[in-house]
Every structure is written in structure tokens, then in C-alpha cells.
């Protein structure tokens, strides 16, 4: 549905040359929710704006639904953009128009008959859960409701693709979850292809099928969400994954934690489980095999792309030789082990 090939984007600021994107290629199959994640300034907003040519690539090809956009005339591009809806971090609603009027605007600009506008807008407001807000003005809506209006407006022309540019960044966590569930529902109901950009791995984890990691204008990793969470290939991907599961060392342990071993100490371990290692009874197996005891301090588990993953803080009691053997055995069974110190 979306195929970006060798996209490069260069900006000129006086004598400065800024390369925002460098030879980026990305394929989003029809009907998928595809996430692009990166830190601020990584190039993700520039990338998504290249899809509908709000930013025209310096080099490269942009195919949407089999149509090459970079070679179209202005009138042809305007027509092609009707198949590409877009929502933003800021809702960009017209304060002088009601909810109905905001959603109706693209249909009015397309000279759609009034009875068809009424039918379509009513249908869309029901879809986004605002069936009772036809006559409300944006000033009377919450942030989540405003974004729902923006989503309805983006769907007014019945597009095949929806672009989401940090669409939940300005929302509180509960509202973010509700908007993401709405996008997932729209994807299922309409078969809509969704490309979203974000700096939050929680967003990717919650609704995406595939994810690409962008850094300094380059895609450094891309795969299914389950594969990236199970086997991240780059330090940046690992960092984003760790941000979704974070366990703080309890304060009483922090006060006692030492960097080097001392007499009668035990190591404190941070264990990361993904895929099959989550469900296997690995800790009890280490106890049987290596005569060690594990005191679990805290643990957290979650799902992403249908794959379970989690982290755990534990003390491992046993002789130095036994604990080292147990740690090596865990690592052999795809558990990432970090020795945080000794208590």
C-alpha cells in the first residue's frame, strides 16, 4: 500500500545543509498498522510528511496504492491526497465551526451533495464515538474528543491510508489508550492502512503489527513488533523496549547495594525474558541444577505483537561458583542477565 524507496530529504538553511533523511526505504502492506519510532529530531515527522508529499523528497520514490506520487501534477496530486488521511499532535480544528462542520469541511471542498455530507458525517461521528456532539464547538471538547473529531475529518474522503503524526503525544495516558483502541478498531472495521510515528514504545506495543526504528535520518531496524521485542538488533531498539518495562531498585536495596562483591554477599540480578523464556520454569530449574535460591524482589510482564516479555529483579543465593554457572545457564536459555551489584 505504501512503498518508500531510497528516500533522501535535504533542507537548506542559508549556507547550512541538513540531511533529514538518508536513503530510507519502507514498505507498509495494505491493512497493516505500521509504527515508526525514534527520538526527537530523528527524522520521523519528515518521513511521514514525505508519504503525502507535504515534504517533497530530494531523491527517491513514493508509491501509494501503486501510484507514484512524485511524478504527479499539482491537480493529480490533490486528487491522490484524498486517498491519504492525516492526523497530527495538534488537532487543527476550526474554532468557528461545530463538530459537524469540521468533519464536513473536506466534503464541502470536494463539492459533495449536502444530503451525502449529512449521511457521511453522521456515520463518521458515530464511528468515533461522538454521535451526540454534532452541534458542539471545539472549545467545549476534551483533548481526546478533539482528536476523535480530527480522525473523523481525516476519514471523510474515505481514504485508503491514514497517517498519524505523534497523534497521542498531547494526551494523557488514559485518553491515549482510548485513541489507540479507536485506531485499532478503525483498522479492523475499514481495513485501513495506518502509518504512525511516535517516540513512545508503548504506542507501538499496543497497536502496531510492524515497527521501524529511525535514528539520524536512517532506518536502523525494522521487523514485526513481536520479532523486535523478542530479538532487538540495535542498542536503540533495546533502549525503547526497556522504556516500556522499567523496574526501580527498592530504596532499602539501593542503600545496601555495592558495586564489588564482599564477604557473605549475594548478587542482585536484572533478568529480561522474551518469547519462550517467559513461560519456561527457568528459575526453579536453576535451583535444582545449581543449588541456588532466587529471592524475587519485583517483576513485571506484558505483551507486544502477541509475544509475552518481562523483567525481574532477584537476589541469587549460592556459592560464587554455583551462581556463575546458573547465570551462564540462564543466558544460554535466552535470558538477558545483568548483575546490578551485590547486597
UniProtKB/Swiss-Prot annotation:
Residues reported in the UniProt entry to bind ATP: 38-45
Keyword Cell membrane applies: yes
CDD domains listed in its UniProt record: ABC_MetN_methionine_transporter
Annotated family: Belongs to the ABC transporter superfamily. Methionine importer (TC 3.A.1.24) family.
Listed PROSITE patterns: ABC_TRANSPORTER_1, ABC_TRANSPORTER_2, METN
Domain ABC transporter: 2-241
UniProt cross-references to Gene3D superfamilies, sorted A to Z: 3.30.70.260, P-loop containing nucleotide triphosphate hydrolases
Enzyme class, spelled out: translocase
Reaction(s) catalysed by this chain's protein: L-methionine(out) + ATP + H2O = L-methionine(in) + ADP + phosphate + H(+); D-methionine(out) + ATP + H2O = D-methionine(in) + ADP + phosphate + H(+)
The keyword Protease belongs to this UniProt entry's keyword annotation: no
CC annotations in GO: Gram-negative-bacterium-type cell wall; plasma membrane
Pfam families in the cross-refs: ABC_tran, NIL
Gene name for this UniProt entry: metN
MF (Gene Ontology): ABC-type D-methionine transporter activity; ATP binding; ATP hydrolysis activity
Annotated keywords: Amino-acid transport, ATP-binding, Cell inner membrane, Cell membrane, Membrane, Nucleotide-binding, Translocase, Transport
EC numbers on record: 7.4.2.11
Record's protein name: Methionine import ATP-binding protein MetN
Xref: InterPro entries: AAA+_ATPase, ABC_MetN_proteobac, ABC_transporter-like_ATP-bd, ABC_transporter-like_CS, ACT-like_dom_sf, MetN_ABC, MetN_ABC_transporter-like, NIL_domain
Role summary: Part of the ABC transporter complex MetNIQ involved in methionine import. Responsible for energy coupling to the transport system.
UniProt-annotated location(s): Cell inner membrane
Main location: membrane
Topology term for the membrane: Peripheral membrane protein
